[in-house]
């Protein structure tokens, strides 16, 4: 064994061995337990960041541990390669997105390999390659024919300068991020998945996922947003509206119906359109509403504005005339684009009514009383007994719900209804770098799916977009085609799919990535699925994880998979955070400096109290810890860390610094500490191996000191097995290894028996570290005399007999205060323990002259003498 620990050489040798032996290539082995461990695949942005390193290290530790339990483990990797960043980079660098993407993939793949991940690279998928998205198009055509995908007009953010649709996050203060033009809302035809058809199942089957964090399940439940309420119809006032009809609203609070004082409609509602005729001010307000963001989150925070119309509707139960307002907070795509407003019991309506001096009528007795003041109180929204509601007075929420429903049914003006917040998933994107939608528009036949023998519809890769709409719409060579049904001249769809579609089924494709007869080989898919452990950030809690669950059910209903859910267990890893430093610039902005360029001063408790820039020695402001990001310039390049310390040190630090689901604070001293620890392990093993390997340990001949050492080894094995296997607490498992290392370093090495015990200890340390620091473990295992590589070794088994103690130390308290300790045989009786405690020299001093009232013995732990 080399005297020095040289990570670069050790890691290169281990990785070469794994490549040569194809150590991570996996095939189906019927009868052997399978384990599918998957980390969310990366977007090929150019370089790995520390968040990636953490995510993939966590997955790799779990995968390697499960392999050591004897399971057939699948851990694949791929690239979520379509998307806007490639288009933006292409425009900036005047290069085709395909070229930029493939170059990034090549570089990032070498980075991932340098981490020593146990990945089966033969299963790699790249979502922008036709051999992948062809099956997405195939499924699209199947679902279109079944009606699960349909086309309808949708409201989008339209940039009139660039002539393109913008995502909500590309609209900044009402203007296009690139052009600066004022954004308009437009209706354009788009394709939608009927995810609402699966809303009930998506909600109910969350209960089948005990291995998911409650927080994520709650977020999905809220997003799906199932609510039982009432559909209420307000008859048109014919004198003001001019014709018969009813205004439909949906409310979850029908008990407050008698408190409705006005109704509000969305800018797109037919009544708004009618009211604006001959009313330029109202028309201008409607146009303003339509130009706002279409994001629900923005709606929630924006100022509530409205304008009255001359129209009236009738209260369905009292016949009272209620004014119709147009309001910017009413969404056309939720409910029926209209709300009944009860200002006394809804905060939004309350704000609006106070702003525009509309009546407020309390109809529920709340904990705040019967009256409603001029300032909103949370209590006003409570359920309670009805007041000021005529025949319904005195009823509680449930009673009022039923009674008001019965009254509305009698008048044929309402009924109870279940509604979902979840909307159908619009997947059309007016972008170039995405999967082409496989539809042909024929003047005679309408929308015709591309036949299977003409798939894939291939995206031309040699295109440099200019940002002004989709280049596909300006490429006749792409869109000119003939109708598959009638043969007439037709036009190919030029929209591409939302990139969330690719990431909604990739986990299934890994089971048979080269299968060319279908989206998946059902036999292989059902062998591996569902994924046993999925790892990724909490930011994907809703969209990606919901869409993947939805797609899995679509694949099940197509007969491609048999399971109901894609991911059995979910681990949402925390962020990687680091200190930030800045100076305020002359324009009032902030110039951020990388921590590597800053010299810091700490107090006695290691808190940062001052910082200076290394280049000029002048102070910089301390901004606190934040998520590593380019904008705050507080990122650490993983590549430089791997080159300086080795992948094992980086992996060890990442796993030791924090539990996986908590934020991890980057610390250079922590990385140094991890490196120091691995050098200690190497030094101890090297000294041991260089003396020659010992013979077998004679368990029957162990002396007391050796028994204590062996107990420490097996205590570490037992605790680490629980920490890693049950709780993914890698940090406490590593702490166990550090504890046993302290014991082994002090252990005697004078006899053959001592050295055989040290051999057992070093083997345990190597095996416990193997999933976390696989390269050094590969080398140590070989040096400790094993022909079989550590990658094929089993997780260490605890010897329960080693944990049995001949003697135990008990603390002795007098009236609850520690006064001494006694060492007793493990099998000592209660009487023997009590006698020893009473006769302890120090205890005698504290009970002298007192009467002993009671002696409490907690076996194996303590004795408490109660005396006065």
UniProtKB/Swiss-Prot annotation:
Its main location: cytoplasm. It is found in: Cytoplasm. ATP binds at residue 630. Keywords: Aminoacyl-tRNA synthetase, ATP-binding, Cytoplasm, Ligase, Nucleotide-binding, Protein biosynthesis. Gene3D superfamilies: 2.20.28.290, 3.10.20.590, HUPs, Isoleucyl-tRNA Synthetase, Domain 1. GO terms for molecular function: aminoacyl-tRNA deacylase activity; ATP binding; leucine-tRNA ligase activity. It catalyses: tRNA(Leu) + L-leucine + ATP = L-leucyl-tRNA(Leu) + AMP + diphosphate. It comes from the Bacteria. PROSITE patterns: AA_TRNA_LIGASE_I. HAMAP family: Leu_tRNA_synth_B. This is Leucine--tRNA ligase. It comes from Pseudomonas putida (strain W619).
């Amino acid at each position: 064994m080399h005297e020095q620990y040289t990570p670069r050489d050790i890691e290169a040798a281990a990785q070469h061995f794994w490549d040569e032996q194809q150590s991570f290539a996996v095939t189906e082995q019927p009868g052997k337990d399978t384990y599918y461990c998957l980390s969310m695949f990366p977007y090929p942005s150019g370089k790995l960041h520390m968040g990636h390193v953490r995510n993939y290290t966590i997955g790799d530790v779990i995968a390697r541990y499960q392999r050591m339990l004897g399971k057939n483990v699948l851990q694949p990797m791929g690239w979520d390669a379509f998307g806007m960043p490639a288009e933006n980079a292409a425009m900036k660098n005047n290069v085709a997105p395909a070229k930029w993407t493939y170059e990034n993939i090549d570089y990032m793949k070498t980075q991932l390999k340098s981490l020593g991940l146990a990945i089966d690279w033969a299963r790699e998928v790249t979502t922008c390659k036709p051999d992948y998205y062809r099956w997405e198009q195939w499924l699209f055509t199947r679902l279109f024919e079944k009606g699960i995908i349909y086309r309808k007009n949708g409201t989008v953010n339209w940039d009139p300068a660039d002539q393109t649709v913008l995502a909500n996050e590309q609209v900044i203060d009402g203007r296009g991020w690139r052009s600066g033009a004022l954004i308009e809302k437009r209706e354009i035809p788009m394709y939608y998945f009927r995810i609402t058809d699966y809303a009930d199942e998506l909600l109910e089957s969350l209960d089948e996922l005990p291995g998911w964090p409650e927080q994520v399940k709650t977020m999905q439940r809220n997003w799906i947003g199932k609510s039982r309420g009432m559909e209420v119809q307000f008859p048109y006032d014919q004198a003001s509206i001019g014709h018969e009809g009813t205004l439909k609203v949906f409310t979850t609070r029908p008990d407050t119906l008698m408190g409705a004082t006005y109704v509000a409609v969305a800018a797109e509602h037919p009544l708004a359109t009618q009211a604006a005729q001959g009313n330029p001010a109202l028309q201008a307000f409607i146009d303003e509403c339509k130009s706002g963001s279409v994001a629900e989150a923005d709606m929630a925070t924006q100022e509530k504005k409205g304008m009255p119309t001359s129209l009236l509707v009738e209260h369905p139960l009292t016949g009272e005339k209620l004014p119709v307002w147009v309001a910017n907070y009413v969404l056309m795509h939720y409910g029926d684009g209209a709300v009944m407003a009860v200002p006394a019991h809804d905060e939004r309506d309350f704000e609006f009514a106070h702003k525009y001096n509309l009546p407020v009528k309390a109809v529920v007795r709340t904990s705040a009383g019967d009256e409603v003041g001029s300032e909103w109180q949370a209590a006003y929204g409570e359920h309670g007994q009805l007041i000021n509601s005529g025949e319904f007075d005195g009823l509680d929420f449930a009673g009022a719900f039923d009674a008001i429903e019965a009254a509305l049914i009698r008048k044929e003006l309402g009924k109870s209804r279940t509604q979902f917040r979840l909307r159908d998933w619009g997947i059309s994107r007016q972008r170039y770098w995405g999967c082409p939608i496989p539809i042909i528009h024929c003047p005679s036949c309408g929308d015709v799916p591309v036949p299977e023998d003409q798939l894939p519809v291939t995206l031309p890769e040699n295109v440099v977009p200019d940002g002004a709409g989709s280049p596909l719409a300006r490429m006749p060579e792409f869109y000119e085609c003939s109708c598959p049904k009638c043969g007439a001249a037709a036009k190919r769809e030029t929209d591409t799919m939302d990139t969330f579609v690719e990431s909604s089924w990739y986990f299934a494709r890994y089971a048979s990535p080269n299968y060319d007869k279908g989206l998946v080989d059902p036999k292989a898919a059902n062998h591996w699925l569902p994924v046993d452990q999925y790892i990724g950030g909490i930011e994907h809690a809703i969209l990606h994880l919901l869409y993947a669950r939805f797609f899995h059910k679509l694949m099940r209903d197509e007969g491609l998979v048999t399971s109901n859910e894609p991911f059995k267990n979910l681990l949402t890893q925390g962020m990687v955070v680091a200190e930030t430093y800045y100076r305020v610039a002359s324009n009032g902005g902030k110039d951020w400096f990388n921590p590597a360029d800053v010299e810091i001063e700490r107090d006695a408790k290691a808190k940062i109290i001052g910082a200076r820039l290394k280049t000029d020695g002048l102070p910089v402001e301390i901004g606190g810890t934040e998520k590593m990001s380019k904008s705050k310039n507080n990122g650490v390049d993983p590549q430089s860390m791997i080159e300086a310390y080795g992948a094992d040190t980086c992996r060890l630090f990442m796993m030791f610094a924090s539990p996986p689901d908590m934020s991890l604070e980057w610390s250079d001293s922590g990385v140094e500490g991890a490196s120091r620890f691995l050098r200690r392990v190497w030094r101890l093993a090297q000294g041991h191996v260089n003396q020659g390997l010992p013979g077998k340990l004679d368990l029957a001949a162990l002396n007391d000191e050796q028994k204590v050492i062996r107990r420490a080894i097996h205590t570490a094995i037992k605790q680490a097995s629980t920490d890693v296997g049950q709780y993914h607490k890698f940090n406490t498992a590593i702490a166990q290894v550090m504890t046993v290392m302290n014991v082994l370093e002090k252990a005697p090495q004078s006899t053959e028996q001592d050295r055989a015990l040290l051999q057992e200890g070093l083997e345990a340390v190597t095996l416990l570290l193997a999933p976390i620091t696989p390269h050094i473990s590969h080398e140590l295992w070989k040096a400790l005399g094993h022909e079989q590589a550590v990658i094929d070794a089993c997780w260490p088994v605890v010897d329960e007999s080693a944990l049995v103690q001949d003697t135990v130390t008990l603390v002795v308290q007098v009236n609850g205060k520690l006064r001494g300790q006694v060492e007793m045989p493990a099998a000592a009786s209660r009487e023997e323990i009590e006698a020893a405690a009473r006769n302890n020299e120090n205890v005698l001093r504290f009970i002298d002259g007192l009467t002993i009232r009671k002696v409490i013995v907690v076996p194996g732990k303590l004795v408490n003498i109660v005396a006065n």
